[in-house]
A protein has these predicted regions:
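Iron-sulfur cluster-binding cysteine motifs and their immediate structural context
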Residues: 1-11, 22-59, 64, 68-84, ...
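Short glycine-/small-residue-rich flexible loop motifs, especially phosphate/cofactor-binding loops
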Residues: 14, 40, 70, 123-124, ...
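Iron-sulfur-associated redox domains of electron-transfer enzymes in respiratory
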Residues: 74, 79-361
Length: 361
């Protein structure tokens, strides 16, 4: 409710205002601004609303677990589920690999994080925590690119299945398109499955930028292969808890994947890898990708496809802007992240997808 003060200036009596927004709508001078909360602005799938008590609530039927609200909340009021204690317990019980081998599967976007140290020192830090081996999720991306290119050629149209938030969005908002989602596991799950099948006493921890991976790890199709998920922020917390200064450590080597597997971390990288997969396998297919950078771009592409007006035969869907390098669990969201991922890709020893996956055969 508006009142007039001693200076004849209108102000809003907060004790009576119910925040209906009507005054903002009728003010001809736009002197009253109706502001959304940061979490609401961040949520592009409209899963966050205000209840009658003006408290923010999350509609789990709309939430895709992308973590945008977690990242954008300036008060730290929204938290994703953490498996840090589970990981600490797994590290302790592994007894430095004597009880079982604990594998750290690191997402390729790690190349753009921990910019105060060298990547090789981060790998050494993981081993200092008690991990037996560090493996690139990008090798799983090479596996996916190889298989997904064949699947695309067979079916004629496909959407990617690497981003769990994107797949959840299709399931919730475009269920009629679910049959068009690639049947391949994500890179995380693909490489974890290989590890579990070849090393019976292995346990796997995925470390990456993505909060939605925590939900993916609970799916029946993925749960047997992934024991826990950590974000880069949580990994930094583990280093801090051990007073581990990784800048003092020697550099270890990470050399499992190809250039194409590594660039999965940024928008457009998946499509480039699928194109390379088609080329390397001599598959005659005219790839027309629709690269969706962010969930709003995904929505537009899926809407066009649902109306049969999309001029593309492959949708690369990434819920976070920039791709995985824009994930909510990242330590940094800088402009240099894409360049760092591309540099990391160029440094790969394996120059083709076939070179990378040959060690698996």
């Amino acid at each position: 409710m508006k009142t007039i003060d001693a200076q004849h200036v209108a102000h809003i009596d907060k004790s009576k205002c119910v925040e209906c927004g009507q005054c903002a709508k009728v003010c001809p001078y736009t002197a009253i601004v109706s502001r959304k909360r940061p979490c609401q602005n961040a949520c592009k799938v409209k899963a966050i609303s205000m209840n009658e008590e003006k408290a923010a609530t999350i509609d789990n039927n709309k939430c895709i677990s992308c973590g945008a609200c977690v990242y954008q909340c300036p008060f730290g009021a929204i938290m994703d589920k953490s498996y840090m204690l589970n990981v600490i317990d797994l590290l302790r019980k592994s007894e430095q690999g004597r009880s079982y081998k604990l594998y750290a599967i690191v997402a390729p976007s790690i190349s753009s994080q921990f910019n105060y140290a060298r990547l090789g020192q981060v790998i050494s830090g993981l081993k200092a925590l008690g991990f037996h081996t560090v493996v690139e999720a990008a090798l799983g991306a090479d596996m996916v690119a190889e298989a997904e290119s064949r699947e695309l050629a067979e079916k004629g149209f496909l959407t990617s299945s690497c981003c769990p938030a994107f797949v959840t969005y299709i399931r919730q908002s475009f269920p009629q398109l679910l049959p068009m989602v690639s049947h391949n596991l994500s890179p995380m799950a693909a490489i974890a499955r290989f590890i579990k099948e070849t090393t019976p006493d292995a346990k796997t921890i995925f470390i990456g930028p993505c909060t939605a991976k925590k939900a993916e790890a609970q799916l029946d199709t993925v749960k047997p292969y992934i024991d826990a998920v950590l974000t880069f922020e949580e990994l930094q917390a583990l280093f801090d808890s051990r007073d581990l200064d990784i800048t003092t450590l020697p550099e270890d080597v990470l050399d499992n994947a190809s250039y194409f597997g590594r660039i999965f971390a940024r928008s457009g990288g998946l499509s480039d890898a699928v194109a390379e997969g088609l080329k390397e396998q001599n598959i005659d297919f005219d790839l027309k990708p629709c690269v969706c950078d962010g969930i709003e771009a995904c929505r537009m592409a899926l809407l066009k496809k649902s109306k049969n007006v999309l001029d593309a035969n492959f949708i690369e869907g990434m819920a976070c802007l920039g791709g995985c390098i824009g994930g909510a669990g990242c330590l940094t969201h800088g402009e240099k992240n894409k360049a760092e991922v591309d540099k990391y890709g160029r440094e790969a020893y394996e120059k083709t997808i076939a070179d990378a996956t040959s060690v698996l055969k």
